[in-house]
From Swiss-Prot:
Protein name: Large ribosomal subunit protein bL20
Source organism (scientific name): Yersinia enterocolitica serotype O:8 / biotype 1B (strain NCTC 13174 / 8081)
Gene behind this protein: rplT
Function, as annotated: Binds directly to 23S ribosomal RNA and is necessary for the in vitro assembly process of the 50S ribosomal subunit. It is not involved in the protein synthesizing functions of that subunit.
Keywords: Ribonucleoprotein, Ribosomal protein, RNA-binding, rRNA-binding
InterPro entries: Ribosomal_bL20, RIBOSOMAL_L20_CS, Ribosomal_protein_bL20_C
Single Gene Ontology BP annotation: translation
């Protein structure tokens, strides 16, 4: 039976990890054992933060809508409730965009929400 030499495989695996760790500080980009841990941890952070990004954007949109609604003498919750009663289905991302870039259109939406609540 032939002897199995694993040098090529190990080198390839190490190179792959060190390539992923490129740009990391100090030993994290140079020493395989440290780089491996850093790459694993980076992957965990990336996985977690891909989910958190969605939550954070929703929070941002709600904060922007709330600020714009309050400029028109209405709270966020009453505004959203009014839109639902007026059967206006615009998601929060678009509402936040309108609130930032088209104040006149947002004011019109607020008026429709107020009318639906009255």
């Amino acid at each position: 039976m032939a002897r199995v030499k694993r040098g090529v495989v190990a080198r390839a695996r190490h190179k792959k990890i060190l390539k992923q760790a490129k740009g990391y500080y100090g030993a994290r980009s140079r020493v395989y054992r440290v780089a491996f841990q850093a790459v694993i941890k980076a992957g965990q952070y990336a996985y977690r933060d891909r989910r958190q990004r969605k939550r954070q954007f929703r929070q941002l949109w709600i904060a922007r809508i709330n600020a714009a609604a309050r400029q028109n003498d209405m709270s966020y919750s009453k505004f959203i409730n009014g839109l639902k009663k007026a059967s206006i289905e615009i998601d929060r991302k678009i509402l936040a965009d309108i609130a930032v870039f088209d104040k006149v259109a947002f004011s019109a939406l607020v008026e429709k929400a107020k009318a639906a609540l009255a």
